[in-house]
Every structure is written in structure tokens, then in C-alpha cells.
């Protein structure tokens, strides 16, 4: 029996995935990605490496933004965010994410919070890590019902896109050249 929990392993894996970045932004409802970012910062400090800037939306202690999402988007557009986390109610094999809902619009069977800024961040942040603790056919579908943010975009130059998908059971990497 290992001397660590599954969640501790996920947090350590997140820190490994973030290695080498200067600035990571984390959403308000993302405790494990935030813990992974803080673990990376602690590792860097112990190794006397450059301090990682962490922006956790909604946090008074770990957020240098005074106007939340607006400043995050400005910082991202200027190329000053190296990593970000996205999840989704549905995720498919092309790394498309659905944050809208399932079923036929406008009478969706399930409705999720929406996609505020997800496509923008997905296009511009160089290292987007898809994170979803649940690993099930309900989440991982052949094709998402709605594309809130596309994983890959043919014929479009974009610095961002999927870097990895981490679940409670597995770590997947992405090859943007393959669909």
C-alpha cells in the first residue's frame, strides 16, 4: 500500500506537468490544480529556482489581479500566462470541451455553468492542462454535444491548446498533429 493518497498523487503530477513555467492561473473552484501549483512553487524555492507566480481567481492571498477575469484575459493576451487548467462536463478524443450542457438546444437535459473565457484561454495559453477527477463514459465521450472550446483548430495558428489530460485514473498527453 503506497504512503500517499490518490489526490496527493494527482497534486504531485500537476506539479510535474507545470515544471518550467513562470506563471500559472487557476480557476476559483480548482483546489487540486491550485495545490499542484503551490507544490511546484515550494519545489522551486527548495531548489533555489525561479519563483513561480500563481494566480488563483477568487483568492485574496494568491491573486494579484484586482479585477478578476478582465485582468486575467489581458495578462493572457500579452503572453504572460504560461499554464491554465480547463475541465468540462464532456471531453472528447480531440480535446474539445463542453461546458454548456447535454441534449438538444435550447431544451438541454443538463445545463452547466457555461464557457466564460474558456475558448480564449484555450487558444492563447501555451500549456493548457485538462483536468477532471471523474474518469467515466459520462465525461469522456466520442464527440461532445457542444464545443465550448476546441482542442485543435486546423489552419489556425495558435500558441495554446491541450498539453495533457489528467483524471483520477490516468494521465494522457496530446499530439496536436493527430486528430
Label each PLM-derived region with a short phrase.
Residues 1-69, 80:
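N-terminal active-site beta-alpha-beta segment that forms phosphate/nucleotide-binding
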Residues 61-179:
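Conserved phosphate- and dinucleotide-binding cores of soluble alpha/beta proteins
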Amino acid at each position: 500500500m503506497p504512503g500517499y493518497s490518490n489526490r496527493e498523487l494527482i497534486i504531485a503530477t500537476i506539479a510535474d506537468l507545470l515544471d518550467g513555467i513562470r506563471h500559472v492561473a487557476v480557476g476559483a473552484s480548482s483546489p487540486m490544480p491550485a495545490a499542484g501549483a503551490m507544490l511546484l512553487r515550494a519545489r522551486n524555492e527548495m531548489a533555489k529556482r525561479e519563483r513561480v507566480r500563481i494566480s488563483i481567481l477568487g483568492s485574496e492571498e494568491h491573486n494579484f489581479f484586482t479585477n478578476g477575469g478582465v485582468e486575467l484575459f489581458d495578462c493572457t493576451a500579452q503572453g504572460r500566462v504560461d499554464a491554465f487548467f480547463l475541465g468540462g462536463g464532456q471531453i472528447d478524443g480531440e480535446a474539445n470541451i463542453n461546458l454548456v450542457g447535454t441534449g438538444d438546444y435550447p431544451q438541454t437535459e443538463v445545463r452547466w455553468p457555461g464557457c466564460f473565457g474558456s475558448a480564449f484561454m484555450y487558444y492563447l495559453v501555451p500549456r493548457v492542462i485538462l483536468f477532471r477527477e471523474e474518469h467515466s463514459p459520462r465525461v469522456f465521450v466520442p464527440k461532445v454535444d457542444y464545443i465550448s472550446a476546441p482542442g485543435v483548430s486546423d489552419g489556425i495558428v495558435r500558441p495554446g491548446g491541450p498539453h495533457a489530460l489528467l483524471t483520477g485514473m490516468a494521465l494522457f498527453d496530446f499530439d496536436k498533429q493527430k486528430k
